[in-house]
Amino acid sequence: MASKKITNMEVKRKNRIYRYVRKSGIVSNPDIAYELKLSLPTVTQNTKELIELGLIKENGELESTGGRKAKALAIEADFRLAAGVDITKNHIGLILTNLAGEILRYERIYYPFCRSEEYFSEVSQKLEKFLKKEKIAAERILGVGISIPGITDMEKREITNSHVLNIKALSFQEMEKFFAYPCIFLNDANAGANAEAFQGEKEKKFFYLS
């Protein structure tokens, strides 16, 4: 039997619903339908599919002022995890978070920066040891965010300049080839701002100082 093709619109709708559930913590299908201005059958079908994918779960029932109680929905926060590596002049920070943005583990290790294959290989090994402490299967890791104090050029895929690390034109490929997971590279200030935006998703505008 041929599998049903999913359109971009359907993917975007499912993403909207998932993000709303994550932002809300506990929510019902009628709440989602009302807030996102979608029909209840559409929302119910999408949340059913998200449950089948393991991304959200039923979490009891919500209180009702009358009539049938609505099922409470919440994200399955530990279904997938994300790792982070914060590179500074003298240290590396390692972090593990779940889909709710909750920090599951954090370590800061003294390890002075050096632009060399040995350095990036060792950082990758330290990350693997860090993850093994939590007994995390590799397939549960969505990817690794790597923050560096420098100017990033996403089109050239390189760190164009870092006064702190005293480097220029450091390509992403020069670093990511040592990691077993998909990598995304960010300027350290942007990484911090993104983390705040993720946690404070209800805020439409905010100002970040680092």
For the regions a language model picked out, list residue spans one by one:
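Gly/Thr-rich phosphate-binding beta-strand-loop-beta motif of the actin/hexokinase/Hsp70
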Residues: 69-106, 207-210
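Short helix-capping/turn signature of helix-turn-helix
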Residues: 23-24, 100, 199
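Conserved phosphate-binding catalytic cores of ATP/NTP-utilizing and phosphoryl-transfer enzymes
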Residues: 58-80, 185-207
